[in-house]
């Protein structure tokens, strides 16, 4: 018997009468626990081990039941280090799944997998909690309309638009602007959609998580003066944590996002960095649970585990969860089972290019490599589709001509090709834009560009109306009117110098 988990404290739910078991075996992060006959916990129930180690230090380890072994024994995975645990220690069955705080109290705070704050800013209001395991929304609850999720970022909205309630893969190495792009999306969804964001750091470096937190405070995404006005909740399960924590931290972040969608009826942005680490943690646990490994040593339940997470990320009639997932590709092998399983769920891919970052074009989104299932005339309309295709054709032609330009120079090209190159260079620069979250570094105010404005701007460049303008006029501006004004200023400056 248990009290409703939605009214209980953080971490796990309270009980009227607790069932006690004892540890009979410990293998790394996996415990076998024996319970009295007829008092077996359910799969996914939280178990808590409390006691003292041999040095007299207090121990408080939460585990999750994964298997029922028979003979009144269960196998559970620990959510924190099992150092100091010994056979014979008492284990409490909490009677329900791990529950975490949800709602406005989570904004601006950092949590671990159990929903405990780890930012030293005091306790969190735990009057509303939710279990991390639940079913995906029923088919009847889903919102089946195909709608574009406008981000205000030109290159994304024009060439690889995001779907409202869709899943986007973000591919990029270190130092190409992934974090800044993530922060800009968090900022824009708060301003344009009145929504909030949840960031799930799954198996990432502690340093990166700390850097992200500091940058969010600096750029105002997390409001230090009034924490309730922050636009994001952070959930971290870092690289140094046991596989149980890394395997479940994605579900903790998703549970917080689901509350904003279902109860507050908001549009939510859910970031998972990195989805590969979720699979990797599942693989580590799978072997310890005694399952036979599948292809390349991955767990045989890979598709099921991925599906149970991804199917909960969707649009309902109340609101939407749009998910952006950083995807690490092991050894750049796209056929590896982990990325291959992830691709099956993605609606769009945003690829960040080191070459563009080296040119100083930010956001460094590769316009030719990034894709979206939304870029179809029946969804985005003929005008948007035609403009996007012509932009891609122009950039593709420029890419083909680059070898010739490098060897022979621009003068050897035909008149038509020279015009294409000039327009492509303008397009390339116009795809850059100043970000709100980068204002503190660049000094130039951020710009949110609506989709209609974006399309109009690229149509004007493609039509040839702006051929006389210098290409630097298109660099780091918002809409096309700003580029025109910048061109006029550049012309006036050059006339004054003469």
Swiss-Prot record:
Q: Which domain of life is it from?
A: Eukaryota
Q: Which positions in this protein are listed as binding ATP?
A: 172-179
What molecular function terms (GO) are annotated for this protein?
ATP binding; ATP hydrolysis activity; proton-transporting ATP synthase activity, rotational mechanism
Q: List the disulfide bonds.
A: none
Alphabetical keyword list? ATP synthesis, ATP-binding, CF(1), Chloroplast, Hydrogen ion transport, Ion transport, Membrane, Nucleotide-binding, Plastid, Thylakoid, Translocase, Transport
- One BP annotation, GO: proton motive force-driven mitochondrial ATP synthesis
Localization of this protein? Plastid, Chloroplast thylakoid membrane
Subunit structure of this chain's protein = F-type ATPases have 2 components, CF(1) - the catalytic core - and CF(0) - the membrane proton channel. CF(1) has five subunits: alpha(3), beta(3), gamma(1), delta(1), epsilon(1). CF(0) has four main subunits: a(1), b(1), b'(1) and c(9-12).
The job of this chain, per UniProt, is described as:
Produces ATP from ADP in the presence of a proton gradient across the membrane. The catalytic sites are hosted primarily by the beta subunits.
Keyword Membrane assigned: yes
Q: What is this protein called?
A: ATP synthase subunit beta, chloroplastic
Keyword Plastid tagged = yes
